[in-house]
């Protein structure tokens, strides 16, 4: 299951009466990675918690991992990591997009301190972290690494380039992770996709971006009107249509047909459905083959991130 070389590219589920999870959602323990490379696995994504693992494996089979958001409690995070073949000993850093409770659980503090995991977040979010209950040990042990929008290195071999995005009062952070094996773009909880984000993610090999809601389901939902107004606003979340448009713009701005993989995050359980997402993205038959839909309860398979090979002039047959 974990070897993406033998798996089909990335498929959406077919609609069923029971709304079964997508085929690329798995729950069996992962096999140990031995080939050097870059891979990504979403442990779960939605309003009930968000956590994504980016894994680097060297030629000796040694692994290091970085978490993008940490929105599950200690037990669930530990279990999900184990299920994906990752232990806390592999986790070197947590990179937070923002501090909503579905993206960071302060109860993880003890595990982060025990395993000496650094927490990277924007200066705008630093005060909120400092006033979150139980997080003081992170500061006392020197594990908090605030950054201004720009570039930093969360762990050797990974360079993070950041951009601030509009979401609620303090915004959220979009990350581009660059390694010798390829680049990953990651953005969630953004009300719209500005031009700077399109440029920021141009050329990434894997794109993780939210596809939160179906607009019609949202306007017809029983949620309070102020919640719907917030989600639909430029400071809320991306709809399926907005996500599709953002992906197409990033593809247009990218060379060599990138991104090779598109991972859709943070699908609303009340105001979205896999079939709604699929109907939007199947407009492009080539794009839908590259798409993985995430799930709140179950992780995705490991997605191996490999840059698309550049076509050399010697390989081209020029029309005369």
Kindly give the residue locations of the regions a language model identified:
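Conserved catalytic scaffold of divalent metal-dependent phosphoesterases
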Residues: 157-162, 166-167, 176-184, 190-192, ...
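Metal-dependent catalytic neighborhoods of phosphoester/phosphodiester hydrolases
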Residues: 105-115, 130-133, 272-279
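Cap/insert and terminal regions of metallo-dependent hydrolase folds
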Residues: 195-295
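Conserved beta-strand hairpin/beta-sheet module of binuclear metal-dependent hydrolase folds
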Residues: 2-84, 171-189, 206
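Active-site neighborhood of phospho(di)ester-bond hydrolases with catalytic His/Asp-centered motifs
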Residues: 67-71, 91-100, 120-123, 185-189, ...
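Active-site metal-binding motif and surrounding structural segment of the metallo-beta-lactamase
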Residues: 63-64, 73-121
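Metallo-beta-lactamase
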Residues: 21-24, 123-181
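C-terminal regulatory/interaction regions
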Residues: 2-24, 273-320
């Amino acid at each position: 299951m974990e070897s993406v070389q033998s798996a089909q590219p990335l498929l959406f589920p077919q609609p069923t009466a029971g709304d079964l999870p997508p085929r690329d959602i798995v729950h069996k323990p992962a096999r140990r990675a031995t080939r050097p490379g870059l891979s990504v696995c979403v442990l779960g994504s939605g309003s009930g918690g968000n956590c994504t693992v980016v894994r680097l494996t060297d030629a000796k089979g040694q692994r290091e991992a970085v978490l993008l958001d940490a929105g599950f409690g200690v037990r669930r995070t530990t279990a999900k990591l184990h299920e994906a073949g990752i232990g806390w000993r592999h986790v070197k850093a947590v990179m937070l997009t923002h501090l909503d409770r579905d993206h960071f659980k302060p109860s993880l503090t003890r595990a982060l301190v025990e395993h000496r995991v650094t927490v990277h977040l924007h200066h705008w979010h630093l005060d909120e972290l400092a006033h979150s209950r139980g997080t003081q040990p992170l500061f006392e042990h020197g594990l908090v690494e605030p950054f201004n929008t720009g570039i930093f290195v969360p762990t050797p071999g990974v360079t993070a380039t950041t951009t601030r995005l509009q979401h609620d009062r303090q915004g959220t952070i979009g990350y581009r992770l660059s390694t010798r094996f390829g680049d990953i773009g990651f953005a969630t909880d953004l009300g719209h996709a500005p031009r700077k984000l399109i440029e920021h993610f141009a050329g990434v090999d894997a794109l993780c971006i939210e596809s939160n809601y179906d607009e019609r389901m949202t306007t017809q939902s029983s949620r309070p009107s102020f919640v719907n107004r917030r989600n639909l606003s430029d400071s809320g979340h991306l709809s399926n249509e907005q996500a599709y448009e953002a992906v197409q713009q990033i593809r247009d701005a990218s060379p060599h047909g990138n991104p090779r993989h598109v991972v859709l995050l943070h699908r609303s359980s009340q105001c979205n459905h896999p079939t709604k997402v699929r109907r939007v993205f199947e407009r492009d038959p080539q794009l839908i083959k590259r798409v993985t839909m995430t799930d709140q309860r179950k992780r995705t398979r490991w997605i191996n991130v490999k840059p698309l090979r550049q076509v050399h002039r010697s390989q081209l047959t020029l029309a005369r």
